[in-house]
Amino acid sequence: MKSKERRKILRKAGDKNFKALDKSFIEFYTLLEKSVFFRKNKKRKYIYMNPEISKMNKIMKLYFKKPQLTFEIDDNIAPIRFETEDGVVISGLKYITDPNSKKWIISCHWFTGHKYWSLYWAKPFIELGYNILVFDFRNHGESDSTDLITLGLLESKDLVAAIKYLTDNEKPQTIGLLGMSMGAYIINYLTVTQQEFLKKHKVKFAISESAYGSIETLLSKIYRSRIKRFFNKKMDNKIISDILKSQEKATLYDWTEMNIFDKYEKENVKPAQIPILFIHGNNDRYTSSSDTTRLFINRSRTIKNDELLIYNFSGHCTSLKEHYNQTVYRWLKFENKIINDDDVTKKALEKLGIVDKIIENNFNESLEISTFYFKEE
């Protein structure tokens, strides 16, 4: 993300406290993308390679050290554009694994991310035969710029529009959703606000990584991490309440509407009957793993097919880098629980380098002794 784009995002954040919060999300991936340099490949001078694909391939090889996640050429990548219900034009991509496939993954990036991060996160599903749709949320990448950034409230309209676009143009039989951080929040938000819509559009499962369940808990986590001092609960609640009030004045939106916990615990909302695999790391600096656990527990009252994976050591949205073997294994086995195609899953795992020897050796974990993983049998 360029400095000009970064300043534009911060100007729209509203209250000054939100500017500080938003800035903390920007720092890491901006630095990572700027650190990658390129040289021309003389052997492939006649092959056009999208510069973003080239950059992301470098990141996957040099930083993630996962060549399995790279793309060779992008002949089967097509740009798309679609419009949201409030008139925002969204920029996206379709990756066509198989023109005859009716299985699709929609992958949703984190705050300050972009569609190419979403595409690379979805790479394991290509080995299962899924086509992929990715897009830039409003105020990100090549999508329209708007007056406000809301960390999920208005951005949820973008995912709704993506699902509608996919249904209208591709007639999928199965849609899976994959979300990271803000993208994960939005998926969870839609499960408690758009239940019939998700059922109608054949959304069958979702994966949620590093989600937050409310702006209140997100603020609490960020400020405890940044300010480095102890707040008692009373002080914590007052500070967050004051921030939200000033944010509502700045944006003219009710930010308490974004509290998913209230929908479960106070309003007794029943979520869409879509199983979710929840993933988080206990040492995440930006969102709390307790949010993910709390979402899982709230959903367990009505949904028995969810799974929960909590790493002791995994940074914000880094499970694919730090725990590649176990994360991809859990993703694909979770999908197979819903879709039931053992042969395809086995071949995909082998192609991605996840063989029995690695699985039996605790996924070759170097950071974990015992990872918390739960599913109901």
Model regions and ranges:
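Catalytic nucleophile-loop/oxyanion-hole region of alpha/beta-hydrolase
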Residues: 140-174
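Short glycine-enriched nucleophile-adjacent loop
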Residues: 184-197, 206
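Conserved alpha/beta-hydrolase
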Residues: 125-144
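Serine-hydrolase catalytic core
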Residues: 241-343, 360-375
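Short beta-strand element of the alpha/beta-hydrolase
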Residues: 102-110
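An N-terminal hydrophobic leader/cap segment in hydrolases
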Residues: 1-83, 93, 346-349, 367-377
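The serine-hydrolase catalytic nucleophile loop
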Residues: 110-124, 290
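Hydrolase active-site cap/lid region
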Residues: 196-256
